Structures are given as C-alpha cells and as structure tokens.
Amino acid sequence: MGKIIGIDLGTTNSCVAVLDGGKARVLENAEGDRTTPSIIAYTDDETIVGQPAKRQAVTNPNNTFFAIKRLIGRRFKDDEVQRDVNIMPFKIIQADNGDAWVESRGNKMAPPQVSAEILKKMKKTAEDFLGEEVTEAVITVPAYFNDSQRQATKDAGRIAGLEVKRIINEPTAAALAYGIDKKQGDNIVAVYDLGGGTFDISIIEIDSNDGDQTFEVLATNGDTHLGGEDFDNRLINYLADEFKKEQGLDLRKDPLAMQRLKEAAEKAKIELSSTNQTEVNLPYITADATGPKHLVVKITRAKLESLVEDLIIRTLEPLKVALADADLSVSDINEVILVGGQTRMPKVQEAVSNFFGKEPRKDVNPDEAVAVGAAIQAGVLSGDVKDVLLLDVTPLSLGIETMGSVMTKLIEKNTTIPTKAQQVFSTADDNQSAVTIHVLQGERKQASANKSLGQFNLDGIEPAPRGMPQIEVMFDIDADGILHVSATDKKTGKKQNITIKASSGLSEEEVAQMVRDAEAHAEEDKKFEELVQSRNQADGLVHATKKQVEEAGDALPADDKAKIEAAMSAVEVATKGNDKEAIEKATQELIEASAKLMEIAQAKAQTQGGAQEGAAKQSNATADDVVDAEFEEVKDDKK
C-alpha cells in the first residue's frame, strides 16, 4: 500500500508532509521551498502553480487566481463573496447553480477545479520524494468550514487524482503536531489559527498516559472569511487612498497597478513584524497625460496596527464563545499555540497573550504545523502511528426546518464526531402524502438565517390526520464531518436517504468530468516535459559537437565538417518547433554524422596517453619538456 500524504491546503500557502521513519517530514517543492503559494495562473498554453505563478501575476492579473479557498463551497450572493468581487483583480462569476465560480480566458471554473491544481503540485512534490505514485491524502480545512465547504474540498482532491481518506480540522492537526511527543500528563491547549483567509480557535484536551494519547476537541469557533488577506486589503486600500490624495488617480481601476500594490502591501506587512517603519516605493505604477506616476509611502508599524485593529479584535469574540462552550475559563488553559502566518504579527501575539494571560508557545512552526498534523493523522489511518486517538467535533449545529420556519436541531455544535442522532416528526396537514426534509446548519432559530445544506422529499405517506404519521429523521456525521441524512415512514417502512451535497455544489457528473479533464492535462504535461527533455539533450549535443569540431581543426575532413554543420543546423531548426520525434530524429542524424569526429577524438586521446607515458619514463626530463597543451586537452576531455 502506498503512503497516505498530509496536505495543508491553505488560502495563501500550501504545504505537504509525509511520515518518514516514523516522523512527519515537510517536503520541499521543485523550487526548493517548504511551502507553496496557493496561486494558480492560466496562460495561452499552460497552467502555472505556486511561486512561478506568483512571479508572473503582475503581468497577468486577470488570469492569476489567489485566495480561491475563500470561494470554495460558497454561493455567489454570499456577503463574503460580494466583498471579494469588488477587490479581486480576477473575475468572480455566478455559476448556473448559484455557486461562486471564476473565469479565465472565457473558461468558467469551479473553485474545487482551481484548488485541484495546488493539490496536484502537492501530490507531485510527494511523489518526487517517495519515488512512487501517491493516490491517498489527508487534507486539512478550517475547523469552522461548513458541510458545503468540506464537500468542495473533497471534490478538489478527487479532481487532483487523490482519494481523500480524511478531512481534518486545521487547529486539531496543529495540536497533533504539537502534542505527539508530549508523553505524559493532561494538557488543555488553545489553538489560535489565523491564516491567510480563515480564523479558527479550538480548545483541545491532550491526554498522554503510558504511551496512549487522546486528542479531544472540547469546542471550536471561528470565522471562515477573516485572515491575512483582509489585513493585506486594509493596507492596499490605505496605499491606494494615499496615492489618490496625492495624484488624483484611483489605482483600483487598474488591475496591473493593483497587483503590484498587493505584492508591495504583503511585503510591507511582513517587514513591519520585525521593524518599526518601512517604505513602499513603486516607480511607474501608472501614468496619465502628464506622464508616469510613482508611489512612495512610508508606513509605520503603529499605522498598520491602527488599520487592522478591528480585525484583531474580531478574533477575540470567538475565543470567548469557545471557552464558554467548553465550560472553561482562561485560567484552565495550559498552553496557547499560534498557527497561520498572520500570527507572526506582534500585535496579534500581544492580543492573544493579553487575552489568555500567558505567552503563546514559540516552538511550533505556524506555517508547517498543520501539514505535519495531517501527516500524523495519515499515519494513524495507515496504522504507522499507534496509540493515538483523535476526537474531533462538528463546528455548527445541524437540524431541519419544521413548522413556522423554525430550525429544530438534531445535533448540537461541538458534538464529538462521528455521531448519529434521530428524532420523530409528523405531518403539518391532514392527509399529507409527502414531506420535504430541509437540512440546515447553523445556530439561529429562524430557519432562513441558517445555511441550507439541501433538501429531499419523502413521499408515499398514507393519508391520515395531521400529527399522526411518524417520520423518523436520522442524521449521521462521519469522521470527515460530512452529513448523511435519512427519513423513514415508520408505518410503511418507506425510506429516503442522501449524503448531503450542498444545495449548490458540484454534481457527480461535473466532478467526474473535471477528473477526466485533469487526467487529460496530466498526459499533456507529461508530453510537454518529454519535449523539453528532448530539446535540452539536443541543445547539449549541438554545444558539445561545436566544441569538438573546433578542437579537431584540420584533422576533420572538409566534407565531414560540412555534413556535421548541416546536421547541427537541422537540430537547431527542429528544437524551435514542438515536434519531439523530429527533434529526436535530427539528434540521431547528428550523432551519426559525427562518427568521424569520434574517431579523431579517440585517436587523439590514445596519442596523448602515449605521450604522457613516454614523458614519465624520461628520468632527466625538465618541466620545459612537458607539452602543456596535451595535458590541458586531456583535462578538457575528462570534462
């Protein structure tokens, strides 16, 4: 059985880890980095992922997608999506099913389809390290992701060619990474996870006793649309406003300028974590009739903190709710762990420290802990990690709509999963022959104020006065936090059941089509890679042959030289095209045309060998007797 890998599919950066010799190991990607920017770009002829995509974003802003995780499993009309529509340089559109999709070069794409490109890169990174195909993964999601967002993440995995063995909450994964080596005692840990696009707080009890470890999530809370991207946007807007005040031009109308501004804002934010002042200097950011314009703005740490103060305060309310749900006070928390790149900001650390009355731990890597935890969970599932029990919870209450548009809860938030719950309902009207089961997720009493997960009908109910039929509704949440619902007429035994797919979401056919598309692209990518290899080999051969022709000098007959030069020209022409077979044919013809060159080189090597042997035997030879040129040529030959 192949390895199950652990993937942190982040809003800003993603990371992959595997168990190696019993320890979780974070893997370096092809660029040599341990984290990969969650950025995908589409050009005329290829899809670019990670750092290369980030580098070309300034020149291709409309087709470079970032923070796609903020759209996954969401409806276009959601308030959070509408906020992003106005600030993202790329196009966010409404799909036929009401979901938020994106558009590039006329192609409409679902967020899981775009996210799958990042997962494919993570998969390839793991395969390069392991030397074998990878088909299974544990993927992390924010603890506060709802059912639709979890389903969409699983869809992304399938499109990338991965069977998602488990969806695990990010703070829980971080706690696993932190606690796996803590062998004794009972600790209550608060995991404060402020990433690129989402915020979570989880209160987790780690019980380590005689080699057995239990990680039990006591409560979780958060905000799935609050993170480092929002901090960046505050700074971007400030810079744009300052420029408008000074120059009278609104950079928000220029996607190219906004992409440069985004890069500069992110860089300035990072710098202000270690310095008190920085300067954003962007020459030629735009131009008008009077000529080019430059943006130069000094920003202090205090200014940045004032711009984002309310965002930091927003993270504190979920902390209070999570503690109350766990029936704990601040003094009950033994350790505080910070996860997510945005927690590197000193003001965030200060706010967390003040809230809990203790300094957060500094021995957990905020960028890698989640992927490490995912790899450990993968090890638990494969049997490589023993004596670890993980008890996670459902973040939001689940129920159905009942009479008067009320949400009746069947499973309360923070219930340990997997779990089941059932309740008997009845009809609202006399002789009602069918009921609609409308499944909801959320904490509000009013049904319409909660997230609709989907609905289905149970028909064939025998005519009876209202309140008489007995309809048993069962909710079953699996270990991924995904809901399965059934409704049974207790009298007739008629049953209807579904795995909740969001009222939006991708259909099975759409996912299957996207999987096929991804497989087709994989074949294209393989062919492209083989073409590049053939080109490189051909270029290398031409370079080496030119050098040998020069070294052979007059020893190479004129007709052989003409043949070789013609063959080299043919290779150079072939490498400019995209026909791999033509390149390989021209390369082979050059090898054959160079046969005489090889003979000359071998003869020369033998002559040089003899000369050296003779020189060694001359006991009275002086240094001047040694022919330097011959030694130099031997060195070159060895190269």
Curated annotation (Swiss-Prot):
InterPro entries reported for this sequence: ATPase_NBD (IPR043129), Chaperone_DnaK (IPR012725), Heat_shock_70_CS (IPR018181), HSP70_C_sf (IPR029048), HSP70_peptide-bd_sf (IPR029047), Hsp_70_fam (IPR013126)
UniProt-listed PROSITE patterns: HSP70_1, HSP70_2, HSP70_3
Region Disordered, residue ranges: 603-639
Keywords per UniProt: ATP-binding, Chaperone, Nucleotide-binding, Phosphoprotein, Stress response
Entry keyword annotation includes Chaperone: yes
SUPFAM superfamilies xref list: Actin-like ATPase domain, Heat shock protein 70kD (HSP70), peptide-binding domain
Keyword rRNA processing on entry: no
MF terms (GO), sorted A to Z: ATP binding; ATP-dependent protein folding chaperone; unfolded protein binding
Biased composition (Low complexity): 603-618
Database matches in CDD domains: ASKHA_NBD_HSP70_DnaK-like (cd10234)
Residues with PTM Phosphothreonine: 198
Family statement: Belongs to the heat shock protein 70 family.
UniProt-listed PANTHER family: HEAT SHOCK PROTEIN 70KDA (PTHR19375)
NCBIfam families: PRK00290.1, PRK05183.1, prok_dnaK
Role summary: Acts as a chaperone.
Protein name in UniProt: Chaperone protein DnaK
Organism: Shewanella sp. (strain MR-7)
Gene: dnaK
